[in-house]
Amino acid sequence: MRYSSGAVEALIEEFAKLPGIGRKTAQRLTMHVLQERRGEVEKLAAALIDVKEKVVRCSICQNITDLGTDPCLLCTSTGRDRSVICVVESPTEVLAFEKTGHYKGLYHVLHGVISPLDGVGPDDIKVRELLARISPDSEGGVREVVLALNPTVEGETTSLYISKLLKPLGINVTRIARGIPVGAELEFIDEATLSRAMDGRSAV
């Protein structure tokens, strides 16, 4: 059943486009917005606009960063091990590893994985940018690349593709330990398990 208000239906449809949000949840969110004070709704609207206007991708690691902070704080930190790069699918995995307080290297965010069924190929994710960071012409010093992609078919395909590109460059390519359940998403794995997975990484 649809609401008679076109504005309500339009907001429900927009909420329902978000990952993991079905129509029922979208309806609840819409009702919440309707019941909130105007000032709170305006703050939400402003935050949505700000995140599109003031957040960019780091020119080095492709992680998200505020406009005016490029390269990002992780890439410019003097306390990171610059010889190791951990490759992840999205910024949420960077946050997950940082929460462990265990990994001290750098990151590279692919913003996706190879998925032929979805029409996503190597050129559609940030593989080229990764290669540029560790090519012989780069300022690098990178000795190890850790593949920390989700244990899915697409993640495995992407890991294999990247490892084949990196091995001829003499880079030590490793992957996090297989204690992560197949099909699980790294952003939802607890810190202790992620730390053990990083410690137990093995050569590809």
From Swiss-Prot:
One GO biological process term: DNA repair
Residue stretches making up the Toprim domain: 83-181
GO MF term list: DNA binding; zinc ion binding
Pfam families reported for this sequence: RecR_C, RecR_HhH, Toprim_4
Keyword entries, A-Z: DNA damage, DNA recombination, DNA repair, Metal-binding, Zinc, Zinc-finger
CDD domains: TOPRIM_recR
Stated family: Belongs to the RecR family.
Known function: May play a role in DNA repair. It seems to be involved in an RecBC-independent recombinational process of DNA repair. It may act with RecF and RecO.
PANTHER family named in the record: RECOMBINATION PROTEIN RECR (PTHR30446:SF0)
NCBIfam families: recR (TIGR00615)
Record protein name field: Recombination protein RecR
Organism listed in the record: Chlorobaculum parvum (strain DSM 263 / NCIMB 8327)
Protein's gene: recR
